[in-house]
Amino acid sequence: LLRAAIHTMQEVVEVGHAHGITFAPMSTFEPAAYATLDDIDEKLITVPQLMHGSRDLEASMLQDLQKGQPTEIRFINGIVTMYGNTYDIKTPFNSLIQEIVEEAQAAKTVPDFETSVTRFAALLNA
């Protein structure tokens, strides 16, 4: 899943840069470093360190799904996909996230973790 997270971040940064967005550093996290997949092995080490402080938090989108409420997926990953299409940048990871969440939202359920992992593994191995 870490590889999928890094690919997702790379898509966000690449699309953002194409749209003229400059990402500000956050603490020790430098979003611009994720504009490419270079040094992915190093990123596989640093991403868990960056996420360590928030490991016990539950995402608001997950909370929405648990309550059967609409999520903000179209305004987060959906925007990345939309602008990716505008700039002819492929965004398969953000698209898959949006697809998984929208399927769960329509079914008023929470995505099955193992099924989602399998879908990301298929994308990584494509």
Summary of predicted features, one role per range:
Residues 2-126:
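NAD(P)-dependent Rossmann-like dehydrogenase/reductase catalytic/cofactor-binding core
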